Amino acid sequence: MYAIVRSGGRQHKVAVGDVVEIDKVADEAGSSIELTPLLVVDGESVTSDKDVLGKVKVTAEVLGETKGPKIRILKYKNKTGYKKRQGHRQKYTQVKVTGIEG
């Protein structure tokens, strides 16, 4: 059994026991969160109906926070001497899926 869940505007394929990195959430390590299911596949049946998915719960335990790779951004304007260099590291929260019920 697995589910497609939405978190932070992105979709992740999860099953029970999977560790997934989602966009940063404000919950502390050790707390439990609920993820929004978009699709649930249970062996032979596929469920994507909103009424049925309203009863399905995907729970996960927050393990901690991590950072993604450093991304370097360079803006350059020709003939004016304008250059701007900037860096960015996306923050993620690691969660472990504890259950898909419903």
From Swiss-Prot:
Molecular function terms from GO: rRNA binding; structural constituent of ribosome
GO biological process: translation
Domain of life: Bacteria
Signal sequence annotation: none
One term under GO cellular component: ribonucleoprotein complex
Alphabetically ordered keywords of this record: Ribonucleoprotein, Ribosomal protein, RNA-binding, rRNA-binding
Reported function: This protein binds to 23S rRNA in the presence of protein L20.
Subunit annotation: Part of the 50S ribosomal subunit. Contacts protein L20.
Family membership noted in the UniProt record: Belongs to the bacterial ribosomal protein bL21 family.
Protein name according to UniProt: Large ribosomal subunit protein bL21
Organism: Cutibacterium acnes (strain DSM 16379 / KPA171202) (Propionibacterium acnes)
Gene name of the record: rplU
